[in-house]
Amino acid sequence: MKYEIKDGDTSWAAKGMFLKDDLILIVKPTGSKHRYDIPGGKIKIGESKEQGLYRECLEEVGLKVKKVKYLGKNEEREKHYFIIKQWDGEIVLQLEEIEKYRWVPLDTVLQYYLTKTAHQGIQMLLDTI
């Protein structure tokens, strides 16, 4: 299903969970005290949620997403979550937004200090495994 963002829809966001073997990519936003997040961000007016995800991932971590699987959304904040297993490129951080990244095991990722949005998406992912 394709959702198109229109004027007034300011809280919609797309977040991607990059998976490599049993690892997941988490990122630390620039200026965040200790919280980690997952790549992604706000969807612009006129973009589909997938287009927003592709753009945000390329901007934040320099990875060109090739294929995604839609996982679901958080009803309260309109955050859409995707599983990403195919991409091109190497990680290149946009330091204005992301200051560092880590590949962490899926079975320990919830032990990290995560944003609420990241925690909800990762928990949704773990519930499907």
How should each PLM-predicted stretch be described?
Residues 1-15:
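Acidic, metal-coordinating catalytic segment for phosphate/diphosphate chemistry
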Residues 19-59:
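Conserved Nudix-box catalytic region and its N-terminal flanking loop in Nudix hydrolases
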Residues 72-107, 124-129:
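Active-site-adjacent beta-strand/loop module that shapes the phosphate/pyrophosphate-binding cleft
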Residues 107-120:
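Short acidic, Gly/Pro-enriched loop/turn segments at secondary-structure junctions
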